[in-house]
């Protein structure tokens, strides 16, 4: 059986480093602060919020939650966002997405201050990620994927990586971040002719499509490393990933579990990005 690579040790190491970094900032009279913007009370937003607040508290990042009504108008939403842009005490802004249909993300993404946009909504941060500019903020989840691979000593340079899923949340940014590590990337999506064949030739497979147990044993090469970003609930009510864990676990060299894999690292990356934003805003 392959090694089950859990997220907790990765998250704990990031948290340890952040605690020391934040102590140093506090010694200079600087307090990192995160503002969470949530429209309505979607259960998955609330679950992520709980994790983000817990992780922030653990490392010493201050937080404030702005819960806005489900039917808020675009003008009112933009007013609230601009207030946070201008609030010098706030270093990072996280907007839960997708937003309700009356709010136009294609407009809002140009409103958020890029220097506070810690989860890559702004096109400026998308551009920085594309260039490999380290001053930007790539999305937290694909950043967590790369952190896990590095933590467990997975060599990426020159390796073949298959990304299953091409969303702006996971697939596309994961492809760019792994490309920046000098891996060779194949991205599979709904129109890909034979995703299983492409995946089965890869050294590293990253899956983020939101389909329970889509990736079966025949998709995975012997000794491959598999990172499962999916979080689903199956027909029996059990939480599972996008990979058929039981079917592939004896074939892989490493695999992340669901739950207990990527998700726990994502909130640590969020806190890390708040601290990075805080330091950049204070020219440190």
From Swiss-Prot:
Descriptive protein name: Bifunctional protein FolD
Catalytic activity entry: (6R)-5,10-methylene-5,6,7,8-tetrahydrofolate + NADP(+) = (6R)-5,10-methenyltetrahydrofolate + NADPH; (6R)-5,10-methenyltetrahydrofolate + H2O = (6R)-10-formyltetrahydrofolate + H(+)
GO CC annotation terms, alphabetical: cytosol
EC number(s) recorded for this UniProt protein: 1.5.1.5, 3.5.4.9
Family the UniProt entry places it in: Belongs to the tetrahydrofolate dehydrogenase/cyclohydrolase family.
A Gene Ontology biological process term: L-histidine biosynthetic process
Residue runs in coiled coils: none
GO terms, molecular function: methenyltetrahydrofolate cyclohydrolase activity; methylenetetrahydrofolate dehydrogenase (NADP+) activity
Pathway(s) annotated for this protein in UniProt: One-carbon metabolism; tetrahydrofolate interconversion
InterPro entries in the record: Aminoacid_DH-like_N_sf (IPR046346), NAD(P)-bd_dom_sf (IPR036291), THF_DH/CycHdrlase (IPR000672), THF_DH/CycHdrlase_cat_dom (IPR020630), THF_DH/CycHdrlase_NAD-bd_dom (IPR020631)
Annotated gene: folD
Matching SUPFAM superfamilies: Aminoacid dehydrogenase-like, N-terminal domain, NAD(P)-binding Rossmann-fold domains
Residues reported to bind NADP(+): 165-167, 190, 231
Key words, A-Z: Amino-acid biosynthesis, Histidine biosynthesis, Hydrolase, Methionine biosynthesis, Multifunctional enzyme, NADP, One-carbon metabolism, Oxidoreductase, Purine biosynthesis
């Amino acid at each position: 059986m392959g090694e089950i690579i859990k997220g907790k040790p990765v998250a704990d190491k990031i948290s340890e480093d952040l605690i020391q970094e934040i102590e140093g900032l506090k010694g200079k009279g600087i307090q990192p602060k995160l503002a969470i913007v949530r429209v309505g009370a979607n259960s998955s937003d609330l679950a992520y919020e709980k994790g983000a607040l817990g992780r922030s508290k653990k490392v010493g990042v201050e937080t404030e939650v702005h819960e806005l009504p489900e039917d808020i108008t675009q003008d009112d939403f933009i007013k609230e966002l601009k207030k946070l842009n201008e609030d010098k005490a706030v270093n990072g802004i996280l907007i839960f997405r997708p937003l309700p249909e009356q709010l136009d993300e294609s407009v809002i993404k140009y409103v958020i201050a890029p220097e506070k946009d810690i989860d890559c909504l702004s096109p400026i941060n998308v551009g920085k990620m594309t260039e490999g500019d380290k001053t930007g903020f790539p999305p937290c989840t694909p950043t967590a994927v790369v952190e896990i691979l590095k933590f467990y000593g997975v060599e990426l340079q020159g390796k073949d990586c298959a990304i299953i899923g091409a969303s702006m949340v996971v697939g596309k940014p994961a492809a760019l971040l792994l490309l920046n590590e000098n891996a060779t990337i194949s991205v599979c999506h709904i129109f890909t002719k034979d995703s299983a064949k492409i995946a089965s030739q890869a050294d590293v497979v990253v899956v983020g499509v939101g389909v329970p147990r889509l990736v079966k044993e025949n998709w995975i090469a012997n000794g491959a490393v598999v990172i499962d970003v999916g979080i689903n609930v199956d027909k029996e009510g059990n939480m599972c990933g996008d990979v058929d864990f039981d079917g592939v676990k004896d074939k892989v060299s490493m695999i992340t579990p669901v739950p207990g894999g990527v998700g726990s690292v994502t909130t640590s990356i969020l806190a890390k990005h708040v601290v990075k934003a805080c330091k950049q805003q204070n020219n440190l």
